[in-house]
């Protein structure tokens, strides 16, 4: 009587392991690239949020200047109220401080996965980037009159 054998042969096992190795070698670079793309997308989203918040704060300041007999936002300093938050202003745009553009854009270092450093310019770096300073958004306050603040996006180190 012959016994039937159950299981895999050594050759079958080697072939399966080789196929899994080849698939892993092709999938790993794509996975790593997805993380980079995700950090770039996050930086672009925060960049857009900061630009929009600065424009909205300026519009709010302009309305305050035009309609109020005692405006809180003046041509050079002051504050404006956005969504119940008092936004610090300089030259009709948010300051680079926490009470300025950080509050206007409603950024939170902990929950947004960013590191917020510097004073003017203010640097918002994406956590987990290869070179955090090169995966960041920089906000420099407006220096005079209706000149917009300098907002730059750097994604070379994401």
PLM features per residue range, with description:
Residues 1-35, 42:
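N-terminal single-pass transmembrane signal-anchor helix
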Residues 6, 17-20, 47, 83, ...:
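Short glycine-rich loop/turn motifs that provide flexible caps or phosphate-binding loops at active sites
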Residues 16, 39-41, 96, 110:
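Short amphipathic alpha-helical "recognition" segments used for binding
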Residues 38-65:
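Membrane-proximal N-terminal amphipathic helix
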Residues 59-158:
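Periplasmic/extracellular, small/polar-rich flexible segments of pilin-like filament-forming proteins
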